[in-house]
């Protein structure tokens, strides 16, 4: 049971630092969604290049402010690699199953207040409500779809509309309501809103033909570019639609050029990311965005997970204020693969109409994953085995097939860089390996996406920046190493295969201490990985060869550290404990085939990876040295960064626990004088 509340737009006040939500009246309208409610944490997100900070949208009492970060690895980088304000005493492995980043999925009958204030009528259309077979021909016959739109869609040679398109296009065309739609990933959501938008442009072509009439907001630049390409495809299929122009506004591109294009092109459709759209609205919103009729939020759950709630509220408020037909004129279309509390709360904030249509295209007994995906879990004893097993699995596929197209998801940017090289050196059959993450500049990212779309023989190695909304044709297999950042991300990752009616496979490699993730996945998303197998190291020679390639890569130590930082960031998501860190650290020795080989840390970075309490369990598994004690032979450069050398040289096999921590007291004393350090370095509670 969902209790709806609505927040009036006038009550939203933003002072550039925090977002305060006020309400004078309360209205409850309950209806049965038959859905599990999930809480997905809003993660840190850079909003423009300024010192502007926002409190977390999902927690009005939080005093934590967003630090600058990128979309990739937002969870891991918030805990890895540098910010000393990481509240490390609150980040112990497995201290509290309910604390930290994860809030438990809510029972479907819980009384959650989502919308506040004035009357807000919600009509729910569950899957059982749909009996009519909707086609583009039937829409044309009912005069709901213009012949030009019909011609464009027909030329794209779709055999039929997908269930999502059948259930959403007609309600959007026949009502003036706001629409919230839940649909599995890879089911054709883009056309579900593009078709009605083009129909609207045709219907209103005599009314302000040079005005922006639709704004589409996406979580990532790459998804915005992809949607813009879908717009162009429709126009290419019917050139008469080319009179309706579109413009992509995304970060990583020249702002002045965006402003110039907005002035010269007079676009009718804007596709962009929240940060850049907000920048444009601040500068020229009153001039160019006064006639907007639609705003569309694609992948709404991703927008919130990244931490865009405040920006989305700002966009909605500005568009309403600029609109010449009143603040309640703009229709909202919100599409999401998951429908949790945060998505509902966002909808409450940004919807304008008194009537909302909630369209659920997923049966309550279905899993949230696509049915045509063959899911597999490979269980290993260690992270070392997981890495080797992954490479061996890909090698096996390559040997069996002439062409092979796959996506590999990894947790961090550093590990993507490292593992891409390792994979290239390990595979005996040549294949195009494309690494992709948010640290790559936008121009190159666009080229990489196009390259992978066109190839039929390649592996796309990426972070979660490639998990949401991206459509790559004919992807046969999706691989995952380590748990995903959140449960919904698992759904979106595997959704990169088995798209547009095709079948596909998805394999995740987990060591035993990670298996709590599987239980959480089954309980909260109804996704059951039936095909599970234990990894058996039957070819020791091959295992040793791959291990050697891994350890000979000079970036391996830092890449492995980033994995430890990643697990620290997701420990509360799946209630992981210190044993995960132990396993990863032991993998360093296992891959070297030498129990005395320990992963080295500088004293100054220990707090970024381990809490004081965790040090009880991992102190015997790490090597901590004072960089100032190395003299001429020290392995730290002048900027105090770790530089990799032959691992055989940096530690004596006979070293004891005491000499691994040599100099720690001197270093601790020196840190007392550091102006920005709040507490001394110590290994004790």
From Swiss-Prot:
GO function term, MF aspect, one: RNA binding
Recorded domain comment: The Q motif is unique to and characteristic of the DEAD box family of RNA helicases and controls ATP binding and hydrolysis.
Database matches in InterPro entries: DEAD/DEAH_box_helicase_dom, Helicase_ATP-bd, Helicase_C-like, P-loop_NTPase
Gene Ontology biological process terms, A to Z: mRNA processing; regulation of translation; RNA splicing
Motif DEAD box positions after renumbering to this chain: 298-301
Reactions catalysed: ATP + H2O = ADP + phosphate + H(+)
PANTHER family assigned: RNA HELICASE
Keywords: ATP-binding, Helicase, Hydrolase, Mitochondrion, mRNA processing, mRNA splicing, Nucleotide-binding, RNA-binding, Transit peptide, Translation regulation
UniProt-recorded name of the protein: ATP-dependent RNA helicase MSS116, mitochondrial
Transit peptide: 1-34
Domain Helicase ATP-binding as annotated: residue spans: 170-357
Enzyme class: hydrolase
Residues that bind ATP: 183-190
The protein's role, per its UniProt record: ATP-dependent RNA helicase required for mitochondrial splicing of group I and II introns. Also required for efficient mitochondrial translation.
